[in-house]
């Protein structure tokens, strides 16, 4: 069975409850480092017509495909979603807006151009919005739609975010089933740069079928490869989302989310190699069985140190906790490659 077929079979078994098309899938506020300054942010996950790649199977770890609308939202629906999300930032004097969907904001079959343009126009006219980021698969980036976005945003800074996950085409194909190549990303990033648009790259630590050590080596190599094209690199730590192939294998004891010690070591090495490149990681679900974790004693502290480092870029803020589980992690790195893919510890 192909990887895509395995993912698609799981998708087809999941029943998604209908939900209002005039409400975002999610929205929240936070703080990001933007041009070296800690900046308030509003993240909006728009409920869209759905990820085109996800409908055909999609990525092995992604449960966001279930966040799409039961029917394509209208222009009015999209504006209502934006209005509801913006209320969460009403007390901020200024903030950055980060736009996501269950797929790609620049896919015109997922988000109609008139809806895309209306959202950007609304944000352009709000003087509090200092920058706009949108996430998209690289194959939907064209000179035409980049120019269209810029013409609406006028002088407001614009950023494109890409879920590259890894610079390895083999891992992206055989572990993630992502459906595009590193060169697809390079072409999209170069198109963005041509028009003065900044680029954010998302990498993912420990997709399926990699040992802990292999996963660490992959991310360190991927940071080196993506650095020439990225203004910021954010490392997502794979977590176990419902209705995914990752979950199916995790339930069988054939997958363990990454150790938090792994991302600590990755960031130390990568920051030394790329001192001027902003590197960040938000350990979603840290400390839980489904999320990246060490032991119960140190997971919370180590996760907090990652969040602090993401804002300060100071390697001294990365946890140096002397926990007993650190020795276990080191032992995992030594011997896991010899256990034929079976995780040593849960």
Swiss-Prot record:
Outcome reported for the amino acid change (mutating residue 62 to A): Loss of archaeosine formation
Keyword presence, Cell wall biogenesis/degradation: no
The reaction(s) this protein catalyses: 7-N-[(5S)-5-amino-5-carboxypentyl]formamidino-7-deazaguanosine(15) in tRNA + S-adenosyl-L-methionine = archaeosine(15) in tRNA + L-1-piperideine-6-carboxylate + 5'-deoxyadenosine + L-methionine + 2 H(+)
Pfam short name (any one): Radical_SAM
EC number: 4.3.2.-
GO cellular component term, pick one: cytoplasm
GO biological process: tRNA wobble base 5-methoxycarbonylmethyl-2-thiouridinylation
Highest taxon, organism lineage: Archaea
Database matches in InterPro entries: ELP3, Elp3/MiaA/NifB-like_rSAM, RaSEA, rSAM
Domain Radical SAM core: 36-276
Pathway per the UniProt entry: tRNA modification; archaeosine-tRNA biosynthesis
Cofactors (names): [4Fe-4S] cluster
Keywords per UniProt: 4Fe-4S, Iron, Iron-sulfur, Lyase, Metal-binding, S-adenosyl-L-methionine, tRNA processing
Family: Belongs to the radical SAM superfamily. RaSEA family.
Subunit-level organization: Forms a robust complex with the archaeosine synthase alpha subunit ArcS. This complex likely consists of an alpha(2)beta(2) heterotetrameric structure.
Protein name, UniProt field: Archaeosine synthase subunit beta
Protein's organism: Methanosarcina acetivorans (strain ATCC 35395 / DSM 2834 / JCM 12185 / C2A)
């Amino acid at each position: 069975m192909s990887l895509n077929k395995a993912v698609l079979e799981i998708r087809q078994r999941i029943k998604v409850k209908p939900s209002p098309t005039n409400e975002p899938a999610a929205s929240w506020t936070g703080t990001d480092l933007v041009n070296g300054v800690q900046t308030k942010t509003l993240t909006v996950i728009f409920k869209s017509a759905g990820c085109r790649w996800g409908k055909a199977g999609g990525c092995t770890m992604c449960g966001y495909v279930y966040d799409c609308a039961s029917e394509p939202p209208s222009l009015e629906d999209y504006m209502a979603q934006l209005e509801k999300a913006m209320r969460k930032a009403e007390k901020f004097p200024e903030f950055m807006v980060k736009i996501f969907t269950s797929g790609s904001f620049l896919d015109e079959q997922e988000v109609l151009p008139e809806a895309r343009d209306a959202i950007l126009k609304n944000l352009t006219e709000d003087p509090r919005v200092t920058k706009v980021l949108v996430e998209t698969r690289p194959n939907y980036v064209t000179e035409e739609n980049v120019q269209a976005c810029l013409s609406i945003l006028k002088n407001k800074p614009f950023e494109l975010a890409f879920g590259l996950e890894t610079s390895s085409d083999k891992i992206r194909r055989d572990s993630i089933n992502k459906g595009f190549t590193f060169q697809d990303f390079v072409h999209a990033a170069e198109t963005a740069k041509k028009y003065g648009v900044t680029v954010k790259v998302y990498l993912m630590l420990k997709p399926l079928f990699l040992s802990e050590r292999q996963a660490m080596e992959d991310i360190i190599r991927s940071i080196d490869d993506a650095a020439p094209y990225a203004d910021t690199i954010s490392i997502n730590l794979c977590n176990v989302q419902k209705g995914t192939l990752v979950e199916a294998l995790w339930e069988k004891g054939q997958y363990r989310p990454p150790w938090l010690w792994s991302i600590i070591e990755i960031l130390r090495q990568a920051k030394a190699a790329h001192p001027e490149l902003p590197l960040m990681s938000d350990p979603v679900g840290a400390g839980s069985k489904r999320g990246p974790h060490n032991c119960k004693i140190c997971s919370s502290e180590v996760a907090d140190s990652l969040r602090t480092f993401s804002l300060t870029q100071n390697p001294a803020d990365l946890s140096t906790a002397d926990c007993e589980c650190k020795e276990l992690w080191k032992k995992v790195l030594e011997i896991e490659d010899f256990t034929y893919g079976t995780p040593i510890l849960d």
